[in-house]
Amino acid sequence: MGRAFDGSYAEYTLLPNGQVYPITTTLSWAELAAVPETYYTAFGSMQNLQIKPTDTVLVRAAASGVGIAFLRLVKAQYPTLRVVGSIRGNNTEKTAVLLGLGYDAIIADNDNVLATDECFDKILELVGPASIKDSFAHIKEYGIICATGLLGGKWYLEDFDPTRDLLHNAYLTTFYSGSVNAEKITQLFAYIDEHDVPVAPEKVFALEEIVAAHQYVESNAGYGKVVVHIN
């Protein structure tokens, strides 16, 4: 709702049974509203990356909603895991915020090229085809790249030769949030409860504050989910 068809602010909605998933959780309503689809996408990507506690992980587009959700999910289970994020340009204010959220280091991404020679065991690629070839150059041997996002505004990867581009015996996978199933949703909420994952939204607005909520989202000043609460 809100994308394929309107009605995401409705007090009551009529949905197909196939889009209704029962869950068991201790989260509040505001916290629960902050989970889908962002944490579902991050959780599926995390599973496909097969994270190990000894890994060094890169998140391209570290300030994105999925990037921050991924950070919180993996750090909740592996607090000492080294997670590095990339952001466009050298933004000291954004870097400070992201380090405060839990990233271990932030790397500048200049025109989809990382300003580092460091390589990583796992890479969550949220920029997409615009930067993925550069990610190929930063993956360790037998590492895994999960191509999940398309934030770079490029939808397809031209001239891709798996034999030549994946030089380090690396693995390339993906996760599509549209492939929703009840089992994975149950796993996600069980994981959040078991590891006490912080999923609280960054801001909560009342329905009467809907204009301010949209102004805040469109300002790109936030670093997390914004929830509109109907009393």
Sequence positions of predicted segments:
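Glycine-rich phosphate/adenylate-binding loop and adjacent beta-alpha elements
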Residues: M1-Y21, L49
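A short acidic, Gly/Pro-enriched loop at the edge of an enzyme's catalytic core
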Residues: L114-I123
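Short conserved AdoMet
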Residues: K52, Y78, K140, L167, ...
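Mid-domain Rossmann-like dinucleotide-binding core that forms the NAD(H)/NADP(H) cofactor-binding site
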Residues: L32-D111
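Glycine-rich phosphate-binding loop and adjacent beta-alpha segment
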Residues: A4, A130-E194, I230-N231
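Short, glycine/polar-rich helix-capping loops at beta-to-alpha or helix-loop-helix junctions
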Residues: S8-Y9, G89-V97, Y156-D161
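N-terminal Rossmann-like NAD(P) cofactor-binding module of classical short-chain dehydrogenase/reductase
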Residues: I123-L124, C146
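C-terminal hydrophobic helical "lid"/dimerization subdomain
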Residues: G44, V180-N231
